[in-house]
Amino acid sequence: MKKFTKVVSLMLAAILMMALCTACGSDSKKDDSTITFGTNAEFPPFEYVTAKGVIGEFDGIDMAIAKQIGEDNGMEAKIENMEFDSLLLALENGQVDAVIAGMTITDEKKDAVDFSEPYYTAKQVMIVKEDSDIQKASDMADKKIVVLQGFTGETCVNEMGYKYESFKKGTEAIMELVNGKCDVVVIDSATAEKYVEDNEGLKIVEDNDAFEAEEYGIAVKKGNTELLDKINKSLDKMMEDGTISELSAKYAESSDAE
């Protein structure tokens, strides 16, 4: 889902340098009774704000997974909501213990942080109006394209060499399409399904040759093997007992994101 662009690549480099500079330092004692996850609650059905969520006002697939990770390890899961591009910096600074935000695992990000095993596989798709003539990615060449800032869709469209406009919120991007201000929105498949369900007159167009599958993982600070082991054990359990599949089906069917 979410992959960093050139500006954030510089931030990743800065995070890596910070990690190297502090590698020999000692961390202050942390509260073992809580685990704080950073997220960007603008990505239904994975994370969004609602009247009553599984963790305070936060709900979605990722939020339910975060809560279960906390419970499996005898900790209370807490959420810090922030801009997506700030998440890994918050992780490096110790503001959060882990990041769960539908984050795509990439080699570039693995240089700066450690990732859990993948817990979800997604791909990029195109949302268009039902009468659109866009049938494949190359048909976007002369169209007005909208993407989400910092997300994988932005990287893909940029690599294709197409011009685009980026928005921070998925709802804003979709309203551009609904109101006829753009021709196509490039976004993650799971989120696309939810937006199409909630907005009449839209459809999803797939192009498996243009968009490769991507895997989501939970990020922790480089070298934090103790926490990473706890997260992976919990994820293993949830994948084996079908919890993650059940959550995916539940939240794909319905979410009351505000």
Tell me the role of every PLM-derived stretch.
Residues A19-A23:
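C-terminal motif of bacterial Sec signal peptides marking the signal peptidase cleavage site
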Residues K29-G102:
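Extracytoplasmic small-molecule ligand-binding "clamshell" domains
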Residues G74-E76, E92-A101, K144, V178-T191, ...:
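Alpha-to-beta junction loops
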